[in-house]
């Protein structure tokens, strides 16, 4: 029989539910009065944000960074739309909802360009052209981009007949000159030391003594390098300072509220995760011990998969489903988990029972988290080519997480850290040795860490009331989902000439 909720668990449940409700109200309030109209620019998914009832508005085109999506830029889009701009935000090839992979020619040639850069610049120009043709658009387009998009937008601006103010966030582009872009805001997070220097270099092309937070001018050229306090490369997108700077640069004189949704997103996602802890106690108590593994055997299980997993990933799986690198990642995790499962099954035995209620709670909570993430923070639903990609990834992540769940069962913090670090170090080492084979998929490393932090916590709480087979199965599916939904897609072959 399920145990009754203790007072601490009941208190957590009440607080978590209140946090979720409050966050949802605030996040939807940030959208109130803003039209969000889906657009399709050829094969590019995009969204138009504008004030309800606005007849005419200046255009702003918003572009995300590598591995990002329109959702990651929505605080910016909502802020600018509320300030009176018509904002078009879009997903680059291979990212977000885009069904078209990027060119695999990501490494620069002798001229300093790459096939991927050429492809994304062309896509950006197509989006700008289509956005300018929308009814009610006035004036030249403003351009706003983050990280990777900063280089793409500067190159695109040089090819446009006219361009309005440009804002680059976490910029690294070396295409900025003392003359172009003419009106340029460069924003960085306080923790982005190197990129803050790049921002100052851009400002000092106009005034050698330019400082952060200072607007400098030379004729028609205007520059400003500004810093958002406390935040880094991702947090800068939700910083109120970033949002105010963008509003004031692109819509001067408009003292409209900014869409400071970052804390509410964290509260919503944190509330969903926290709710699993009290919910888990409602499960029937069917906990089963994991295999008895001493430190010596544990070390063998950590070291044995490293070399075969890395070598096989480097030499096989180059092109699967027409995508580059994806097969290698699935192979790495599958071999790693397969070796560990084989050793565990032979020497210790495996749990073989699946508890439907525990599995349903784990998958249901994970789905709820994914839906909230996808609506408010970042693209996190597998669509289009990412659906078969999830099935492929599951061939690797299921054995990996089944082995992981058996080894993590009743393990102390030291073993849990080692279980996370060993595959990360092996895969990271393989990427460093052969970046042209595995480097395009480096984003799986931070995704895996976030997966363990979020979904691993859910699995640990639910795992106290079930066995490792149930948790391994559930987390294996969720890890496949996470990789498939978030990994940038590169084609296995390119026909681009650049």
Residue ranges and their predicted role:
Residues 31-258:
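Soluble extramembrane regions of membrane proteins in the secretory/endomembrane system
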Residues 27-30, 283-286, 462-469:
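Membrane-interface capping segments at transmembrane-helix boundaries
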Residues 270-307:
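Juxtamembrane interface at the cytosolic side of transmembrane helices
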Residues 268-277, 335-336, 395-397:
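Hydrophobic alpha-helical transmembrane segments
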Residues 2-40, 45-48:
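An N-terminal hydrophobic leader/cap segment in hydrolases
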Residues 300-498:
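Alpha-helical transmembrane segments of integral membrane proteins
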Residues 255-268:
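Juxtamembrane/start-of-transmembrane alpha-helix segments at the extracytoplasmic/lumenal side
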Residues 9-10, 261-263, 295-299, 351-358:
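Alpha-helical transmembrane segments and their helix-start/interface "positive-inside/aromatic belt" motifs
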């Amino acid at each position: 029989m399920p145990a009754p909720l203790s007072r601490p668990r009941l208190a957590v449940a009440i607080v978590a539910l209140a946090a979720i409700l409050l966050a949802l109200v605030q996040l939807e309030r940030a959208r109130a009065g803003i039209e969000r109209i889906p657009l399709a620019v050829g094969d590019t998914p995009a969204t138009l944000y504008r004030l309800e009832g606005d007849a005419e508005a200046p255009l702003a085109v918003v572009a995300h960074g590598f591995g990002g999506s329109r959702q990651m830029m929505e605080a910016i889009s909502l802020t600018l739309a509320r300030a009176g701009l018509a904002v078009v935000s879009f997903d680059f090839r291979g990212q977000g909802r885009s069904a078209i992979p990027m060119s695999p020619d990501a490494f620069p040639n002798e001229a300093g360009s790459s096939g991927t850069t050429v492809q994304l610049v062309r896509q950006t120009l197509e989006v700008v052209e289509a956005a300018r043709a929308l009814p009610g658009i006035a004036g030249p387009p403003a351009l706003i981009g983050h990280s990777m998009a900063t280089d793409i937008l500067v190159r695109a601006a040089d090819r446009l007949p006219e361009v309005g103010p440009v804002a680059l966030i976490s910029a690294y582009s070396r295409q900025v000159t003392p003359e172009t872009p003419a009106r340029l805001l460069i924003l960085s997070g306080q923790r982005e030391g190197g990129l803050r220097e790049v921002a100052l270099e851009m400002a000092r092309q106009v005034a050698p003594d330019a400082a952060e937070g200072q607007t400098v001018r030379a004729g028609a050229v205007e520059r400003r390098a500004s810093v958002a306090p406390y935040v880094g490369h991702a947090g800068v997108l939700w910083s109120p300072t970033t949002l105010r700077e963008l509003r004031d640069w692109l819509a001067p004189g408009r003292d409209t509220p900014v869409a400071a949704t970052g804390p509410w997103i964290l509260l919503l996602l944190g509330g969903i995760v926290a709710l699993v802890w009290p919910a888990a106690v409602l499960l029937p108590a069917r906990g089963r011990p994991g295999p008895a593994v001493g430190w010596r055997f544990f070390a063998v299980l950590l070291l044995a998969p490293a070399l075969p997993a890395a070598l096989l990933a480097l030499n096989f799986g180059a092109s699967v489903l027409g995508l580059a690198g994806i097969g290698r990642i699935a192979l790495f995790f599958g071999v790693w988990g397969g070796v560990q499962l084989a050793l565990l099954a032979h020497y210790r035995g495996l749990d073989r029972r699946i508890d439907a209620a525990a599995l349903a709670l784990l998958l249901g909570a994970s789905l709820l988290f994914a839906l909230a993430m996808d609506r408010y923070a970042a693209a996190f639903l597998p669509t289009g080519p990412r659906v078969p990609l999830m099935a492929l990834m599951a061939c690797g992540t299921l054995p990996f997480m089944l082995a992981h769940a058996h080894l993590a069962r009743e393990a102390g913090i030291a073993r849990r850290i080692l279980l996370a670090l060993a595959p990360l170090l092996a895969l990271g080492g393989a990427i460093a040795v052969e970046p042209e084979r595995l480097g395009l998929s480096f984003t799986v490393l931070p995704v895996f860490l976030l997966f363990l932090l979020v979904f691993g916590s859910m699995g640990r709480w639910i795992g106290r009331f079930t066995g490792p087979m149930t948790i391994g199965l559930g987390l294996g599916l969720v890890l496949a989902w996470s990789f498939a939904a978030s990994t940038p897609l590169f084609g296995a072959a390119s026909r681009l000439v650049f």
